[in-house]
């Protein structure tokens, strides 16, 4: 068993969180990650409703035995924080408040009996979330799928580990037992894993996304803002999103087109023109596999590798 701060604090057996991927990580995915020994986080995106959260929470709770976690986009709560209320009503164990200053919301998370964690992309982010009183941080590197920063996982992880007394998890490019073993050996308390789970049948979202990920290599991603602009998603400019390349990115990435032009060309139902957010570990996803099987394999292989040196 891989014992860390994360496993001891949550009472889980695998030091792994399933990433709260908006539009992809619902109750089935989260529940299966939890049932396999980690903790799956439901992605509470700004377009989700309290009714959707309640329904997905019930699924995750039944599959995972009651343990729940969620991830929210902190910047979106400034205009409307009712989604946080809906999350806390589900009595989660962990709430991830990322991409912005969580200070206004951490006390509410703690009052609800949950741990507050934050993904960070720079040391400046670290100082902000430390001041906010979070319980742990996730050093998320540029390799990660979806929205992320611009520093690679290993450089960022090392700097964060040397700069804080908070428990630190790692995210970005971790899609196998080798990846988990590497960050644990570096001093992380666990990993946040997303891309490795994206081809699992438990994900929500378009069917073509799983097929495209399995067919992709690790060179088939691009860090871009065109999909946010095409869908009128008001993400702060400092966070682009890593997605699989397709005809749409070939035509529009880096072109400087206006939102109306980008929106007119976008079609989320067409794999050539829709978005599939995924990280540089895409080349490690070679088939569609159940999420629980993936989590168990990652844990087993990481333990085998670490035992060689322990």
Task: Give residue spans per PLM region.
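Conserved active-site-proximal phosphate/metal-binding subdomains
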Residues: 153-165, 169, 175-310
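Active-site entrance/lid segments in N-terminal catalytic domains of soluble metabolic enzymes
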Residues: 1-167
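Residue-level detector of alpha-helix initiation sites
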Residues: 24, 174-175
């Amino acid at each position: 068993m891989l014992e860390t701060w994360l496993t001891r604090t949550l009472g889980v057996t695998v030091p792994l969180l399933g990433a709260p991927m908006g539009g992809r990580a619902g109750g089935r995915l989260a529940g299966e990650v939890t049932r396999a020994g980690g903790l799956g986080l439901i992605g509470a995106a700004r377009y989700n409703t309290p009714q959707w959260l309640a329904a997905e929470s019930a699924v995750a709770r039944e599959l995972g035995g009651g343990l729940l976690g969620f991830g929210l986009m902190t910047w979106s709560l400034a205009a409307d924080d009712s989604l946080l209320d809906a999350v806390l009503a589900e009595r989660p164990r962990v709430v991830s408040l990322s991409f912005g200053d969580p200070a206004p919301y951490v006390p509410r998370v703690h009052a609800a009996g949950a741990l507050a964690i934050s993904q960070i992309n720079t040391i400046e982010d670290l100082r902000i979330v430390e001041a906010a009183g979070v319980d742990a941080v996730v050093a998320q590197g540029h390799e990660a799928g979806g929205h992320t920063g611009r520093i690679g996982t290993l450089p960022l992880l090392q700097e964060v580990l040397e700069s804080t007394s908070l428990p630190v998890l790692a995210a970005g490019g971790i899609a196998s037992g080798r990846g988990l073993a590497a960050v644990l050996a570096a001093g992380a308390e666990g990993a946040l894993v997303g891309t490795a789970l994206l081809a699992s049948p438990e994900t929500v979202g378009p069917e073509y996304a799983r097929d495209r990920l399995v067919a992709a290599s690790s060179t088939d991603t691009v860090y871009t803002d065109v999909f946010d602009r095409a869908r009128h998603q008001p993400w702060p400019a400092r966070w682009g999103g890593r997605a699989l390349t397709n005809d749409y990115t070939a035509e529009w990435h880096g072109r400087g087109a206006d939102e109306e032009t980008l929106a007119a060309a976008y079609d989320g139902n067409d794999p050539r023109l829709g978005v599939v957010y995924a990280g540089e570990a895409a080349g490690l996803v070679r088939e569609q596999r159940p999420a629980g099987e993936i989590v168990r394999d990652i844990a087993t292989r990481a333990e085998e590798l670490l035992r060689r040196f322990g």
